[in-house]
């Protein structure tokens, strides 16, 4: 199969990641739950991985790197832990439901009021709206780094500066960019960065986390076993234990650690250059085919995603045909991004997303171009 659904999950993992998970399953104990060698080795792997993530994302304190099972959990921890009744929040039309649904629920429960920065017909945010929507009670701007639908990126350094100038927190969903695009929390004024391991970081599913700037207090989202301060009735106050109740996914974190080593060895810039070259090759190959509509802005910063429709064909039918007759994996439908589809006018038809990763080749791209051309001519 030609796998072009990497914005959902990166299918092909580096061999070192697979080896690390297999080794961990036979050697790792439960970190913080014993003084024997297996428990201590697990604790060392977990702490080392915190340090690697802190270095990658520009987080000044590894203890403020919190492990979760994915970015959805990370976002729920952040968004349910920083707001008080009466707070105002700004988000955008580019968001995934992992941002939207926690915010909608908080709005429904009367905790927050909520405004959205609109996107235009190409999926670009109105940057002036970030300023115009600011209120005295604005507690945070919450936004994605890149749309999972179009690949268009938000200039988070620009938005972070606006948030900092107004005394608001800046929470970033880096699901589509972690490992694929350089991120520096300090330079970009990011207060809370939420990420997943199974996409650009090329780590196992079930890994992810959030990085928290010093001085930011987040209430625990879940409480329970911590391995320390066990006689206290409340969850320990210090990070990371404050937000990490229960046994961590040590086996997955071992794989994430190996993935970070691989990423550092190859280099994010090299990976980004390769992915963008594949994306550009595909875009150039399909953009002039009659009956093809492509969504998004290809003149600004973006990820390696091309989303399109063929004539008025149902996007799910197109994706099914690509899989069945051409052995090409893509993602159709709504992509958990309803507001973006409404901005693009594709809420009924959906769209077919092609997303490229480090392991893809030019041969993969050329086969996909040929398939799209043939289907458009049917």
Report the location of each language-model feature.
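Pyridoxal 5′-phosphate
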Residues: 1-378
């Amino acid at each position: 199969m030609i796998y072009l659904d990497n914005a959902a999950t990166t299918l092909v993992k580096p061999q070192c990641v697979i080896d690390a998970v297999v080794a961990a399953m036979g050697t790792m104990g439960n970190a913080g739950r014993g003084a024997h060698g297996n428990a201590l080795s697990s604790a060392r792997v977990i702490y080392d991985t915190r340090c690697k993530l802190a270095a990658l994302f520009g987080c000044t304190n590894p203890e403020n790197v919190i492990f979760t099972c994915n970015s959805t959990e990370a976002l729920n921890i952040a968004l349910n832990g920083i707001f008080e009744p009466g707070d105002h929040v700004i988000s955008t039309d580019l968001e995934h439901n992992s941002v939207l649904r926690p915010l909608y629920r908080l709005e429904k429960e009367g905790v927050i009021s909520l405004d959205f920065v609109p996107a235009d017909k190409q999926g670009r945010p109105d940057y002036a709206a970030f300023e115009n929507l600011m209120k005295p009670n604005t507690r945070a701007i919450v936004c994605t780094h890149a749309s999972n639908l179009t690949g268009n990126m938000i200039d988070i350094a620009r938005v972070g500066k606006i948030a900092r100038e107004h005394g608001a927190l800046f929470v970033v969903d880096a699901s589509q960019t972690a490992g694929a695009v350089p991120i520096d929390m300090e330079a970009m004024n990011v207060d809370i960065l939420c990420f997943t391991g199974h996409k650009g970081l090329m780590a196992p599913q079930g890994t992810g986390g959030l990085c928290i700037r010093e001085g930011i207090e987040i209430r625990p989202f879940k409480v329970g076993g911590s391995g320390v301060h066990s006689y206290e009735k409340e969850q320990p106050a210090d990070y990371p234990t404050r937000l990490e109740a229960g046994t961590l996914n040590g086996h997955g974190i071992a794989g994430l650690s190996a993935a970070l080593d691989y990423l550092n060895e190859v280099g994010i810039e090299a990976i980004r250059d390769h992915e963008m070259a594949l994306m550009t090759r595909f875009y150039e190959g399909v953009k002039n085919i009659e009956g093809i509509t492509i969504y998004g802005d290809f003149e600004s910063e973006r990820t390696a995603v091309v989303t399109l429709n063929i004539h008025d064909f149902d996007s799910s039918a197109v994706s099914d045909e690509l899989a069945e007759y051409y052995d090409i994996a893509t993602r159709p439908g709504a992509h958990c991004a309803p507001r973006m589809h409404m901005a693009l006018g594709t809420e009924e038809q959906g769209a077919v997303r092609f997303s490229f990763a480090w392991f893809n080749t030019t041969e993969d791209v050329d086969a996909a171009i040929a398939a799209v051309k043939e289907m458009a001519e049917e």
